[in-house]
């Protein structure tokens, strides 16, 4: 589905694909990311403004001409904004992606299985989506690295932070 064709509205309504942000402050924060990027030279390909549905709804936004001095480059957005970056080499884009204090989730697209494993392992993020934008489900461990947290929620790993593991090795039991 093309980003322009996304249906904005009540997240519980049939056919709606983009719901509201949790609060007006959250929406204002996302808009501040967009405004910062545009003021520093980014281009809005689509979206970039509040939706007609209200102050908690932001149109899905694609930004190009994004540079490293923009907030969208370094910070977690938590809104429907996709900043697109240009790069020349795999090593360059990995360095760019990891050059942030945050590390919750990242996404990339590739058909090359070798590249998928190389890049996926090199990215410093708790969750990596490859050729997929919907990366959360009840079976997947959810959590980040760096300033995006430690530990995982959900999945079979969700209880690990609450457990103390003890190893007991016995010998000399021959009577």
Where do the model's predicted regions map?
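Conserved C-terminal structural/oligomerization subdomain of aldehyde/semialdehyde dehydrogenase
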Residues: 50, 57-175
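Short secondary-structure junctions
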Residues: 41-48
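Flexible, acidic loop-helix segments that line cofactor/substrate-binding pockets
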Residues: 4-32, 49-57, 74-79, 138-146
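A general structural signal marking secondary-structure boundaries and capping sites
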Residues: 6-10, 41, 166
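Generic structural motif recognizing short loop/turn segments at the entrances and edges of beta-strands
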Residues: 40-41, 54
């Amino acid at each position: 589905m093309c980003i322009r064709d996304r249906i904005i509205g009540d997240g519980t309504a049939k056919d709606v694909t983009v719901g509201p942000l949790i609060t007006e402050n959250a929406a204002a924060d996302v808009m501040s990311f967009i405004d910062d990027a545009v003021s520093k030279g980014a281009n809005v390909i689509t979206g970039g403004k509040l939706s007609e549905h209200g102050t908690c709804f932001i149109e899905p936004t694609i930004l190009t001409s994004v540079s490293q001095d923009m907030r969208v480059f370094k910070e977690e957005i938590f809104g429907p904004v996709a900043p697109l970056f240009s790069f020349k080499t795999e090593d360059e884009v990995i360095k760019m992606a990891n050059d942030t204090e945050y590390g919750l989730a990242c996404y990339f697209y590739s058909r090359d299985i070798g590249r998928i494993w190389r890049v996926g392992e090199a990215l410093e993020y708790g969750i990596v989506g490859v050729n997929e934008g919907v990366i959360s489900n009840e079976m997947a461990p959810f959590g980040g690295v760096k300033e995006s947290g430690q530990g995982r929620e959900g999945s079979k790993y969700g209880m690990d932070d609450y457990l103390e593991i003890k190893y007991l090795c016995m010998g000399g039991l021959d009577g």
